[in-house]
Amino acid sequence: MKLKYKVILIINFVTVLFSIFTFIGYLNNLIGFRVVTISLCITIAMTVYLLYKKRKGFLLVYLIYLFLTNFGVFVTNIFLANPLVEYHGDLSWYYINTSNLFSIATFAILTFTILSNFISVFSKINPSRKFDIKSKGNNLFYYTGILFIIGFTIQFLFYIITGRLAINTYGDYVSSIQELPMYTYGIFFFSIGIAFAFSNVKKTHIKYLVIILTPQVLFFLITGNRGEVFYPILSALGVLIVRNYKIKWWMIITIVFTLFFVIPFIKVFRNMDSSSIEKVDINWFSSLVEIGYTLRPLGYVTRWIDGGESIVYGKSYLAPIQNIFSYIIPGLQPVNYEMVGYGFRYRLPGMGFNVIAEAYYNGAIVGVLIVMVLLVLLLWKFTNFKSFEMLSMGTAIVSVLINNIRNAFSFVPAYILIIIVIVIILLFIDSYLKKETKAD
């Protein structure tokens, strides 16, 4: 073992241990939240570096997004007494229950971080060498991915040109997509396309994928709909790391600049008139708090539980599976989400949801522990697939799981089932084409 790697492991171990002790101190009212937050930030940074070196790309990207979506507000709170200064309306979900929210979010992220470190250090299984980015994967999966990307881009432009999709403001955009059910499926296939393409692309061809993706990414950023960019791009970044693609410093700087300056500028510029351009005021924390606002559903869930509502012991995870089987098993009734406590989109309309909040609603802190453990094991398993075809499937599922960070679980089983069906169909086609080629 090289000396540099040993030093990294020691530093990483110390930061994890320090975060655990500071968190215990916080729970016993001995340490303030700022110390815990700073400690956790350092631990996350060291863990991300270790995961990158060990090519655990799926764990890496999931951890980053889990942290940003649940700790963006707390990180801002280190510097600002009121991190929600740009927000109005009912903010009691945060201010009344800040300590409880902080404890739950810290426990979840620290659990994920500790397990990721443990697997990275002690696991003897590493990504297959044949996945190296210098090699090209399955051609059928690669070109199917490109087809899905181009297909959704055409659909997106068609909706805009025909006036069915409004892009004047983010509010208009959200309202118009409610009337376009096929748009949601288009986005889903777009994310599958990105997963398939980057799982099988050769290093010298990455630039062509970037060219194909750039128009669509710009359209999403202009409309203010960043989610459709983050989920698939993060999964693509994850699989590139698994495939030993080297991330350059200029790439990291570009991402940070885009996140903290370009996107906030677009948001401000799109909501102002030409006479007030000189009054543009971009706050460094705007994007961080907006991403971290995903914490809000957890605030409501803890209020429900503290108010006497019972935890549901996994029912919200079983409900979508029951709904799938209700189509094929006579007499099995689908779950009516409007009639149950875990119909989150009806209880908190337009709010999205939160993976930690749903885990807490199902099993309190034990539920959070179980979900974090399962996620780490799943993401680790996807990293260790041995064929490009399975890696493609794993990357597509990772995109769904990243999407789930800011949404309820209800869509996840159906999306995973669709991905599996697509992969099976492509495997049959690929097998047939190879047989035909041999016959010729």
Swiss-Prot record:
Transmembrane stretches, start-end: 7-27, 31-51, 60-80, 102-122, 141-161, 179-199, 204-224, 249-269, 324-344, 360-380, 382-402, 409-429
Primary site of residence: membrane
GO terms (BP aspect): capsule polysaccharide biosynthetic process
Protein name as catalogued: Protein CapE
Species in which this protein is naturally found: Staphylococcus aureus
Membrane topology label: Multi-pass membrane protein
InterPro entries from the UniProt entry: O-ag_pol_Wzy
Location(s) in or outside the cell: Cell membrane
Function, as annotated: Required for the biosynthesis of type 1 capsular polysaccharide.
Pathway: Capsule biogenesis; capsule polysaccharide biosynthesis
Record keywords, A-Z: Capsule biogenesis/degradation, Cell membrane, Exopolysaccharide synthesis, Membrane, Transmembrane, Transmembrane helix
Gene expressing this chain: capE
One GO cellular component term: plasma membrane
